[in-house]
Amino acid sequence: MKFKSLITTTLALGVIASTGANLDTNEASAAAKQIDKSSSSLHHGYSKIQIPYTITVNGTSQNILSSLTFNKNQQISYKDIENKVKSVLYFNRGISDIDLRLSKQAKYTVHFKNGTKRVVDLKAGIHTADLINTSDIKAISVNVDTKKQVKDKEAKANVQVPYTITVNGTSQNILSNLTFKKNQQISYKDLENNVKSVLKSNRGITDVDLRLSKQAKFTVNFKNGTKKVIDLKAGIYTANLINTGGIKNININVETKKQAKDKEAKVNNQVPYSINLNGTTTNIQSNLAFSNKPWTNYKNLTTKVKSVLKSDRGVSERDLKHAKKAYYTVYFKNGGKRVIHLNSNIYTANLVHAKDVKRIEVTVKTVSKVKAERYVPYTIAVNGASNPTLSDLKFTGDSRVSYSDIKKKVKSVLKHDRGIGERELKYAEKATYTVHFKNGTKKVINLNSNISQLNLLYVKDIKNIDIDVKTGAKAKVYSYVPYTIAVNGTTTPIASKLKLSNKQLIGYQDLNKKVKSVLKHDRGINDIELKFAKQAKYTIHFKNGKTQVVDLKSDIFTRNLFSVKDIKKIDINVKQQSKSNKALNKVTNKATKVKFPVTINGFSNLVSNEFAFLHPHKITTNDLNAKLRLALRSDQGITKHDIGLSERTVYKVYFKDGSSKLEDLKAAKQDSKVFKATDIKKVDIEIKF
């Protein structure tokens, strides 16, 4: 069982991420558009195309109603298609990357509309630099052949023995069988372990229940007509061995001791009760259970009444404390009655016998919550367009509110209904709300003003609230710079642009990060591939006609700063070496493996303790971060996204010289101080979701 399942449940669930949310971090945004997403005049990028696909696993296909979604007329690589294929394999058939690596065969075929096709091996990890147009693809068929032959062979070598379970004279139909290896010599002790296992899983009978039972035995019926009865309570076994192929079936019989419970049930006295909550009474099938001895007092009786109020009607101690009425009436069989207040801490010293009680009536009248809640209708107009709003602003508690309270409510519904947050309001041309009173007056409040109105007003005097926002164009905050990417002389049209902030000057080092980000996002070229490329550079074309060429492989940058508004466009050019993969493998093979123990929340042996470093005598915290994240993902399935959603993910590095250092795995930047991997004594990781 993976450690991830110990510390999180429905991340699951709960956990939902969209690839679109990463556009800002990838620094490759669509062309400038206004904040108002409801405007029909905005350009939303590519139109979509649906490509049908099939999945065949071990020769079996399933009907798949969904399709793979791509941008229409977009140039994509086979690596992009492979990512899509792996995603649907995992989603539709539960086949992970590890399953693919261990499979006999894993490939997909791209069928083009011109009749040609291309077969790609999912296990190879080698991708051609060719780009294909999504509109040329007719269909995609996926074929995976997993290694199940060994399991099939084992299944044939197994024998299924039917069994029955009888508990207290009652039998249930059991469709499963006991599984043994064919013609295996087993002892009665082994057979007993199997019997105890099915007793626990099918009927919930444990070893303790068997020891306390009146009778517990199982009968082995052989194919030759003989049988053997074994006492499950004895713990004594014969040394005889039996052949699994000679067993016909097994009958299990258990008789538990229920007499004590039956006797106890007879001495309990049942008292009927009813609950009247705010004038409404519901039928209650259960009774209050009391023992004949000893006598009970009214304090214990009050505790029982409060318990059924909580379980049957959800009325807690707090609700009772603020209730208008809260009492119960005890009716006796002799015609008398007694009223007890649930909020009183004074009890009489009288004792009452449960046999003398005829019934108990509980009456509770809670404070009406309607008076404490007030609703004010509102409208929202963004850039002159108003949508009908069916909900109202809800005010609870005090009947008087301040303009500061109203402002918080207004900002909340702007965020919830129209997706306008604090940042958009800050740069909006206009952001106001108007409070219309029932006496005909009105008050206009600026949402961006920090001046607070000290006046308090009654919510019941407000007729409605009109919210008006005019967003400023995002171009005032951001500039969108067009760019091109040429890889090995091949250029593909790119509809998106680099999104750069206008609020401050930018340097070549910052621009380098943006360029590397779009190279990785658009063409799948990472830092290692850039390192081994023949040429990797980009040219900045300024609006004044000047150009500046920057080498992506160099770590030396000029200190010049310039305005984003002065950039006309950026051309990116990468020439890859044909033997880069071999060179990369050669470097990887030279990596030095360093061992040190790693624990997660105090548990050891959950992740690998062996890490490969290219330069173990010269690493940074960032290098260690990458290795730990990789180990968490591969060994425990904890991804970078899971770490981002966690409440706390830190690790402490203990060095051999006695020093230690605490680092945050969620942080983007770490200390650049260099140290030796061989100096690490151990690493303790703490994850809290």
Swiss-Prot record:
Record remark on domains: Each MAP domain contains a 31-residue subdomain that shares striking sequence homology with a segment present in the peptide binding groove of the beta chain of the MHC class II proteins from different mammalian species.
Name of the protein in its database record: Protein map
Entries under InterPro entries matching the protein: MAP_dom (IPR005298)
Role description: Both native and recombinant protein bound to labeled vitronectin, fibrinogen, recombinant osteopontin and fibronectin. It was also shown to be able to bind to a 15-amino acid synthetic peptide of vitronectin. Map could affect the severity of arthritis and osteomyelitis in mice through a T-cell-mediated mechanism and could play a role in abscess formation through a T-cell-independent mechanisms. It could potentiate the survival of the bacterium by modulating host immunity.
Keywords: Repeat, Signal
Start and stop residues of the MAP repeats: 45-154, 155-264, 265-374, 375-474, 475-584, 589-689
Organism: Staphylococcus aureus
Keyword Glycosyltransferase: no
Gene name tied to this protein: map
Keyword Repeat appears in the UniProt entry: yes
Pfam families: MAP
Signal peptide: 1-30
